[in-house]
Amino acid sequence: MDEKRLTHLRQLEAESIHIIREVAAEFGNPVMLYSIGKDSSVMLHLARKAFFPGTLPFPLLHVDTGWKFSEMYQFRDRTAKEYGFELLVHKNPEGVAMGINPFVHGSAKHTDIMKTEGLKQALNKYGFDAAFGGARRDEEKSRAKERIYSFRDRFHRWDPKNQRPELWHNYNGQINKGESIRVFPLSNWTELDIWQYIFLEKIDIIPLYLAKPRPVVERDGMLLMVDDDRIDLQPGEVISQRMVRFRTLGCWPLTGAVESEAQTLPEIIEEMLVSTTSERQGRMIDRDQSGSMELKKRQGYF
């Protein structure tokens, strides 16, 4: 990795650590959202650096839908045990009682009840006034216009027309009771930055990001990995072994794999250098309707 690139990554690292420390100093009850993916892994690594040799001054929160890849649950529990941080896991009890199923109820309803409502329930339950998230501006157009400190009202709603100015590295965290701030320390990172930093810092990642033969079924132009026996095969669908990996991770029935031969971090980085598509092309929830992500964020989604 050349010196200019290394300097660029260290600048991003310093900015993110500064943001994490600012939030820890400014807010009374912050939390870090942990979705188990590559961005969460980088954000956790940066947080550990920010407070080394001490422990994290805030817990991690995983909003569980019950439909994550089995490898994600294993990686989550192993990471929590290895690093010894406080891990909170919340699953929407009403959604569980209703038997919400992405195959039966669709991606929009599943996401709204199990993720958006589940997140709001957890934030209310523990009274968090700031929540870190691993979203980046290069991921999607609504995230591109969102501030690093993203103000949310007492219903956890985001208003893109009512955002606070952020001049240089000055952030406005003033809130009233019941309001909160979503904080995005990785806002200025790109997908390539993330992978190069993972390689540079030797950060442990879930193997789903690396290509290997996996059982998949083709549906609506996406390759869905068959993770367990809850798969609802449609007429004419056949499960086959394909060499695939994931660029983004979510609920397995709603997350498409990409065909790839990249089995190592250098090969992923090489693939990123020539990629012309968004990593979120594999997220079914982004296809629900035009402006889908912005609508979800207005309702309280991350």
UniProtKB/Swiss-Prot annotation:
Its EC number is 2.7.7.4. Disulfide bonds: none annotated. Coiled coil: none annotated. It is an enzyme of class 2 (transferase). InterPro entries: PAPS_reduct_dom (IPR002500), Rossmann-like_a/b/a_fold (IPR014729), SO4_adenylTrfase_ssu (IPR011784), Sulfate_adenylyltrnsfr_sub2 (IPR050128). GO terms for molecular function: ATP binding; sulfate adenylyltransferase (ATP) activity. The keyword Kinase does not apply. Gene3D superfamilies: HUPs. It catalyses: sulfate + ATP + H(+) = adenosine 5'-phosphosulfate + diphosphate. The keyword RNA-binding does not apply. GO terms for biological process: hydrogen sulfide biosynthetic process; sulfate assimilation. It comes from the Bacteria. CDD domains: Sulfate_adenylyltransferase_2. Pathway: Sulfur metabolism; hydrogen sulfide biosynthesis; sulfite from sulfate: step 1/3. Pfam families: PAPS_reduct (PF01507). Keywords: ATP-binding, Nucleotide-binding, Nucleotidyltransferase, Transferase. Belongs to the PAPS reductase family. CysD subfamily. Heterodimer composed of CysD, the smaller subunit, and CysN. HAMAP family: Sulf_adenylyltr_sub2 (MF_00064). This is Sulfate adenylyltransferase subunit 2. It comes from Serratia proteamaculans (strain 568). The gene is cysD.
